[in-house]
């Protein structure tokens, strides 16, 4: 007699295929079902993971390009997906998920290996992802595929508050000045971490009106920038939180000024607080946020593929959010 496991392993998912914008409802369903089941296994019964804002999905899909991959079942329904991103030599995966009824049959390994292969083929030198640190199953699963645990990423929030003067915003510049600002952001980033490039994310955020990039200058020279989203993360929610996706500060002494510029922008844009996802390697930045009144909200475990480690900025602070 066939068992449930026999039935699962007998099925074959077709993929990877490129993600289409019309796939967003299907992606949302798989995302919600998979992570709701993950919380249930962790003892958080009754938690239902909501759908993400379709505009955020569009950003993730267009940012990833051909790195956005889906696998389909016999009825063409989405049964798994992996969204692999690269920013110059920095590569990471997320979100990625498999429908609960398709798990335990090897599909999870297939989609992760596809993401690894795509990132390696696109000359990334960093291949990483994040997972919940309390979830031993996930950590063991990724470790079996060659990922090594790194430090925690800690999410902290600061309340929005007015500042003395608003920072310059990329979205309000002329087309020519935007080109110049992009070049400055690239130069600043690569002066701290060679090969990193957040130009595409800056331009896409502007094109989709999801947020903006703050440009902090001293005597006309760019000393910091912060790419952030103000659009709600969850479908149907109001604007509550400004999320910092990328942040580069030339010197730790300028970190607080950049944070205060973000707090001011949050107030001006109608959001209640600013969320920073701080990699554990930047302990001084973490301590500064706590001293400013930052509240710890969440933790994630950062993991990188063996042979593809994540570097720390040689000077200054470079924060890179590995979630959308």
Stretches found by the model and what they are:
Residues 93, 119-134, 268-279:
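Conserved GNAT acetyl-CoA-binding A-motif
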Residues 89-101, 237-251:
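Conserved acetyl-CoA binding element of GNAT-fold acetyltransferases
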Residues 1-22, 159-178:
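Conserved N-terminal entry element of GNAT/NAT acetyltransferase domains
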Residues 68-70, 76-85, 92-97, 215, ...:
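Conserved beta-strand in the GNAT
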Residues 3-7, 29-83, 193-215:
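Active-site rim helix/loop that mediates acceptor-substrate recognition in acyltransferases
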Residues 105, 109, 121-126, 133-152, ...:
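Conserved active-site alpha-helix within GNAT-family acetyltransferase domains
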Residues 27, 124, 144-243:
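Amide-forming acyltransferase catalytic core, primarily the GNAT-like/NAT-type
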Residues 95-98, 104-121, 140-144, 252-265:
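Conserved acetyl-CoA-binding loop-helix of GNAT-fold acetyltransferases
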